Amino acid sequence: MSFQLAPYLAKSVPGIGILGGIVGGAAALAKNARLLKDKQITGTEAAIDTGKEAAGAGLATAFSAVAATAVGGGLVVSLGAALIAGVAAKYAWDLGVDFIEKELRHGKSAEATASDEDILREELA
């Protein structure tokens, strides 16, 4: 009998997250391949974006599975919980990635006048 990847990964939450990362990464790669072909982004930008999207999709998928399992209930309740949890996780992931990228672009220096709390408050406003 041949190896069955999806059923194997579906046996655990990390496996479900990996499967979500594969699917999310494939979708991002398809999008970035078109942008790369049209010379709208560089190869490096495509690779970085694909990696970020794959990781975010994997995290959101795993979180979604945990939420649906924890809530239980019928099909509609489980689907609703999975959708809400997945959206929340991906939204939080994207905010975090954007914040980190902004910090890296601006080069946080030791002599910075703004405290970490001020920067976070500015980002959340």
Swiss-Prot record:
Residues 1-8, 86-125 are cytoplasmic. The chain crosses the membrane at residues 9-29, 65-85. One of its GO terms (cellular component) is magnetosome membrane. Keywords: Biomineralization, Iron, Magnetosome, Membrane, Metal-binding, Transmembrane, Transmembrane helix. The keyword Ion transport does not apply. Disruption phenotype: Single gene deletion leads to slightly smaller magnetite crystals, but no other measurable phenotype. Deletion of any 2 genes encoded in this operon (mamC, mamD, mamF and mamG) decreases crystal size regardless of the protein combination. Deletion of the operon leads to smaller magnetite crystals in irregularly spaced chains, but no other phenotype. Deletion of approximately 80 kb of DNA, including this operon, leads to cells that are non-magnetic, lack internal membrane systems, grow poorly, have reduced mobility and take-up and accumulate iron poorly. Residues 30-64 are lumenal. Induction: Part of the probable 4 gene mamGFDC operon. It is a multi-pass membrane protein. Plays a role in regulating magnetite crystal size. The lumenal domain may bind the magnetite crystals, affecting crystal size and shape. The lumenal magnetite interacting component (MIC, residues 36-56) probably binds magnetite. The most abundant protein in purified magnetosomes. NCBIfam families: MamC (NF038051). This is Magnetosome protein MamC.
